[in-house]
Design a protein with these regions (language model features):
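Alpha-helical elements of Rossmann-like donor-binding domains used by nucleotide-donor carbohydrate transfer enzymes
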Residues: 26, 51, 55-58, 100, ...
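Generic structural signal for small/hydrophobic residues in well-ordered secondary structure
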Residues: 10, 15-19, 59, 81, ...
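Glycine-rich NAD(P)-binding loop of Rossmann-like domains
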Residues: 1-27
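A short helix-to-beta-strand connector/capping loop
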Residues: 36, 109, 131-135
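C-terminal helix-to-coil terminal segments
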Residues: 1-6, 121-181
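Rossmann-like adenosine-cofactor binding region
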Residues: 43-128
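Gly/Ala-rich phosphate-binding loop of Rossmann-like dinucleotide-binding domains
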Residues: 28, 32, 105-106
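Short, hydrophobic beta-strand segments that form beta-sheet elements in well-ordered domains
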Residues: 15-17, 35-42, 113-118
Length: 181
């Protein structure tokens, strides 16, 4: 099988994590624990992204969405990646130019992509990414299990109680300009 040449021992795999928030930090720890070589770009220094994506087996996007990250993964970034590399997006869908991603995947300029998020969710049936063989798109329900549902229900009950007592809520999410969402 021609794919066997791409199977590497973990200690020979190189991964670039783009975005060093909660998700990025957890990924770094997990990947390093199994011997994968990891480099990190935080959200303040990703302007050199096109240069930094080279020579990695995996490029994992964990970026939040803001004015400076919108569509920062574009044709120049994808064509700078090695032909044997994979792109993974667990950040925000809008940080990726999907037309450019489609182009590089359709022309086999990179090996493949794994997306937990897309630009417009839910994904439309006519989205051209759905018809490629070298992409896997999850339905953005990675935490949808019985255990995660139990945790979410407990968190909701705790927050409901805190709300009725005029206490600050837990796990509040803020948008890019610092407003609660």
């Amino acid at each position: 099988d021609s794919n066997m040449e791409y199977i590497l021992p973990f200690n020979e795999v190189k991964c670039l994590i783009v975005g060093y928030g909660n998700i990025g930090k957890k990924l770094v720890g997990l990947l390093k624990s199994i011997g994968i070589k990891v480099d990190v770009i935080d959200k303040t220094n990703f302007q050199n992204l096109d240069k930094l994506v080279k020579n990695n087996n995996f490029v994992i996007n964990c970026l939040p969405l803001n004015n400076s990250t919108k569509e920062c993964f574009k044709l120049s970034t994808f064509t700078s990646m090695s032909s044997y590399s994979y792109f993974i997006n667990v950040g925000r869908g809008e940080t990726v130019n999907e037309k450019d991603l489609f182009y590089v995947l359709d022309n086999n300029l990179i090996r493949g992509a794994f997306l937990d998020v897309v630009q417009n969710e839910p994904i439309k049936k006519d989205n051209q990414l759905l018809y490629l063989d070298n992409i896997f798109i999850s339905p953005h329900i990675a935490n949808f299990s019985n255990k995660s549902q139990d945790i979410q229900i407990k968190d909701f009950i705790v927050n409901l109680s805190r709300y009725t007592q005029n206490k600050p809520l837990l796990n509040v999410v803020y948008n890019s300009i610092g407003e609660k969402i």
